[in-house]
Amino acid sequence: MIEEVSRNEMLSTIHYMTEHFPYRLAGSPCEAAASRYVTERLKQYGLEVENKEFYTYNSDPMYSKVTVLEPEMEIDSLPCAHIRATKPEGEIFELIYVGNGDYAAYKDIDVTGKMVLVEVSYAPPVPEKARIAYEMGAAGIMCMNWGNDEEVICRRGLKGVWGNPTEANFHCIPEIVGVGVTRGAGLKLKQLCLEGRKVEVKVTAIADRTWSIVHQPTAILHGNGSSDEFLLVCSHLDAWKPGVTCNATGNATTLEICRI
């Protein structure tokens, strides 16, 4: 089977998806078009195919701006998904560094009404950092990227609930402002905080939270019926722009397995 894998076929799929469907935000027209493309490809391979639709609690992070008031400087940022949006003119927060953002990081620190600066290179996962921050009284969270000091910002979601929320856990979604910044910018702010200086930031972060229809292409290749065992292959279709390694590569791999 490995000998039948076509590098050119997979690269063609990756290029097509990233050129035609670069920002596959769940529930968006781009995501819907990508789902139709995948569905048609699966049909061509002779599988039993269905492009399912279902409602999900969704979020579109639209815009953010972060200005450090003292010392004055503007830093690049991206808004997180599933946040409490700020006022259009922005809101001012005192910034407090809390390391990895777990419960122990808040010992003897009062973050009530403030924005916490967290590092995301280790546990707990970012949505849990946001949930803990909100539980501790924080009004906002700023996530510095992990890795080298490159000018890269990751898109992040702070929903704090896996899958669709229910009546039982809807309250677990933190009502908190959230933005992501580069590691370089985060390290500068971290140093200011560790020096004992009062760091104030003006943050504008705009994102919505709404129920919307999303798509899930599924396909079945039936066996000969001699066994109840099955093989499940999956890859998420939705993606932040440009959506190459997350996850056009995964989609191309899934389609190539189906082709073979």
Regions flagged by a language model, labelled:
Residues S35-R36, N58-Y63, P124-K129, D149-R156, ...:
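Extracytoplasmic/secreted cell-surface and envelope-processing proteins
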